[in-house]
Amino acid sequence: MFIYVINGEGSMVNWNDEIKKWLTSGTDTKEDIMDMVWNVKDEKTYLIAENPKIPFTLYIYNSEKFIRIIASTGLNTALLEPLQRLDIYRKLLLLNDKIDMTKFVISGTNEEIILKVDLDAASLDKNEFGDALMGVLTSLYMMIREFQLEDEFNKRLTDRIVNMIQEKIAEGATREELLEFLVKKIGLDQKTAENILNEITNKFEYLPEYQ
């Protein structure tokens, strides 16, 4: 299912294609968030966007009037004690009062903390989408600080990078290609990249190819 919307100029826009182009056409050489190159999966009714530098998965839904960005935190509250949940919900409401456009909500049977923003498809362009994306990520990092979850999300980010490296090894990537990925894509210095790669490949079954 493809969602087409008539923009302000009267032309038809396939938002799945347009947003995917915005997220994948960067160079990873600038500080601008829209210059980051995202891995985007098109699930027809929504897009899944991931970046090795960001410990969150984005889900981008299209409707006739709105583009909705949802950031999954993986933090579920359904089984917490009532006082814990009350404290979390209070902090989320206070965060909502500090941020514009984006809002924290509780979603699903697991009552996961998610962040979402709705954008008007009739007037949406790349700059507005980039501003919304920056707002989403800024709000999420505010949440991390508020709940003192830096270690949790640093570990999640490390696990994502390790999984990506293992997938690339399984696909036949050379050591040079893996180092280039860690240095240019992730932004690590050469020595750190080599240490991480050594640690990963020492545990991987294709080790002989990389010695």
Give a label for each model feature:
Residues 2-53, 178:
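Charge-rich, low-complexity N-terminal segments
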Residues 37, 105-107, 145-159:
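Short, surface-exposed recognition loops or helix-turn segments adjacent to catalytic cores
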Residues 56-78:
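A short acidic-to-branched-hydrophobic micro-motif
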Residues 72-112:
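Short, internal acidic amphipathic alpha-helical interface segments
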Residues 87-99, 119-151:
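Ampiphathic alpha-helical segments that act as solvent-exposed interaction surfaces
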Residues 113-118:
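Short, aliphatic-rich beta-strand segments
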Residues 154-204:
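Acidic, Ser/Thr-rich low-complexity intrinsically disordered segments
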Residues 205-211:
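Short Lys/Arg-enriched helix C-cap and helix-to-coil transition segments
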